[in-house]
Amino acid sequence: MESYKKLFKVENERCDEMIFSLQCLDHPDYTQKKNRGFGNRCLPPDPSGNGLGWNNYIINPQFAESYENRDGSKFNWDDIIPGYNDMGIDKRMVYFLRNNITETERKNAVAAGADMSKYDASGNEERIKKAYENRDPRMAMSVITPYASFLGGVEGTPKEYVMRYPFRSYTTYGDLKTDTSLKFYYLNRKFVGEGLELPNIYSELDLPFIRYADVLLNWAEALNELNDLPGAISKVNEVRERAGAQLLGTNEFTQVTGKTDMHQRIMNERHWELIG
């Protein structure tokens, strides 16, 4: 599983899986800026002392919800928090609040429409974290989810920061800071430097345009169109196995029912594997 995460590090940017990449150097004229636009404010400091990352590009919540459970079954919020799907979006905010909020934070949540009758002062964080604990492993390696940690470097040394809401302080509380701390996001992990790995706005990390997993999924799609369902499943499973996901055809949730079903599964696989 860790091999998936390590693909997007400088030491593996030219490994055998990378077929065609935009090659970058540690120089402002020969670089890419995903480290900044996909990042957060707890990346290493810029000349003014602020974290150099900006979360210009964030993860769509519907995309985050699309990640399967680890066993290949579909994720359903009601399995984690009964009644969640029937609640209004504003009311659901209560489940994303940090433990032991202050009176001011409570008043702000009420004003925003949160159903505070559902708030658990000592276990709110632990409850929402369960929604992300048993998912396709690529989710945790691609997305910073609520109350997950991120190894940042804004204070000059590597330090773990936690995605909490409402944000208070990255120095005193170790909260992960974003551009607009009044909002809570799903943030990117892929192509974002951890600790002090990528200390500049510009990044030397190569950007892959085509890698072997992409080839396998194209191959699977072609085989599926030729009605070779076993062949298509085999190619997709090569991708899923490396990531640590449940292989297709190995339990009740991963049985492929036909060509149309396989087409959708390949599309989903492309999303989860190639995000970023």
Predicted segments, located by residue:
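Acidic/polar-rich alpha-helix caps and helix-coil junctions
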Residues: M1-L52, S73-G276
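Structured-RNA-binding interfaces characteristic of tRNA pseudouridine synthases
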Residues: S66
